[in-house]
Amino acid sequence: MSQIVVGPLLRFVSDTEATLFVETDGECEVEILGRTEPTFRIEGHHYALVRLEGLEPDSRYEYEVALDGERRWPEPGSELPPSVIRTLDGDGPLQICFGSCRVALPHEPPYTESKDTDEDGFEVDALRMLARRMVEGDAREWPDQLFLLGDQIYVDEAAPETRERIRQRRGTDTPPGEEVADFEEYTWLYAESWREPVIRWLFSTVSLSMLWDDHDMSDDWNISVAWLEEIRRQSWWHRRAEAGIVSYWIYQHLGNLSPKELDENDVYRQVRGNQRADEPLFEWAREINATGAGTRWSFYRDFGRTRAIFIDSRAGRVLEEDRRAIVDDEEWDWIVQHAHGDFDHLLIATTVPFLLSPAFHHLEAWNEEMCDGALGSVAARASEKLRCAVDFDHWAAFQESFGKLRDLLSEVAEGKLGSAPGSVVVLSGDVHHAYLCEVGFRSDGKHRSPVYQAVCSPYRNPLDRKERRVVRAGFTGTLTAFARTLAKLAGAPDPEIRWRLLDGPCFDNQVATLEFEGRSATMRLEKTVPGREDDGALEQSFERRLV
């Protein structure tokens, strides 16, 4: 009889609908709450996205998962609470947890020790501690949503069991060595990353939204045209890239879509229930890898009176000799179309921060001008190498896109695109530290809703002491003044906004929580403590009322 390999993952949830994802070890029919869905098959792996419709708003449904009529979830002997689906209440309070960057490592010494005291230390997983608190706590205090904003897996730092399986399967003497090479190895990494019982329970009970970042595909993915040209010369890259696209679509993106969007998705229509789905899915992935076209990865979710727009900040980049952009014009038009007011709160989720520390913003803007030839071709080539070496790949390094998002935020906050919301918050991860900034626009006499940049990273992958010193320097006046001068001399445009650090930077394994009630909003950051895994091991770093 078939067994569950990955999942169940609770994905899209509205007031009357929900979708749940499972991977199984054989072809079967998956049943949840009386709804059934046949699996589809990709290179010997079997998947289903079960759709539940006609649910009651503001309701709680305990559920089990059956494969061909045999119960497979919860697992026999599990002491975890029942998995539940909680449909939305359009007018009620909303709690969203978010963050990014989570390595898959054992939860035992030395891996749970501080990185400063043990080279193998990655400290304690913040999501694991969140789940354990939920298990022991009041269900009325559980988060409604969990945003995973990039680097859900690390293909270039494969988890221990995946690395060992790679050694046994093909060896590591030739590229890409211990990194993931194809779809089969991607499936191992997802399974190892999401298989721990308490994480499985968390993902089965809190609705998940996901965006990919570079480590889901490759370190520095799509940082520049020079990087892209170099990686495409590697014999192993195209197979990796196609596998990365297919695996992301299956494990992460598919569940971001509503039932209506699934009905309209041409690729899903070809794959659903198909026992030979490899051909259409990999053909589609080859087209995307070759041309960069073929899909829009950005999406949006409405949670009652709060709208969240999730911007794909990696796959859809424009990388040309004379132009750089985070997304192309067509996708940007889609973002503008959906980023209107008329909500109590507007969230813009983008894996890479819109606003960095002021010094590093100016350094990235300077670097882009240098790459574009501000001081000639020799300096441009050196600047491209610097861009990759120090990860200058955020919105500040794509000034065209930075300016567009800045202006969009201003227009929404002014009420030019519908009624002004109570708050506008940009949510990001990627940078392995957390902070909260308030955005200041030019003094023009116009009233604007408060606008914030909220960053939370990592769930589990902390910086070492040296890296932390570099990050802190970016918030100092001395380095900011120096970097601003460099950027100005190179011809970089002024950002035309200023931002004030309210809280942080914080360098722990951590999880952020946004709480909304009516037009009020609060942000809280909580951290884990190296070596400590008791049920009270999440400690508050800061809490701030946003509006």
Feature locations, PLM:
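Metal-dependent phosphoester/phosphodiester hydrolase catalytic core
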Residues: 1-547
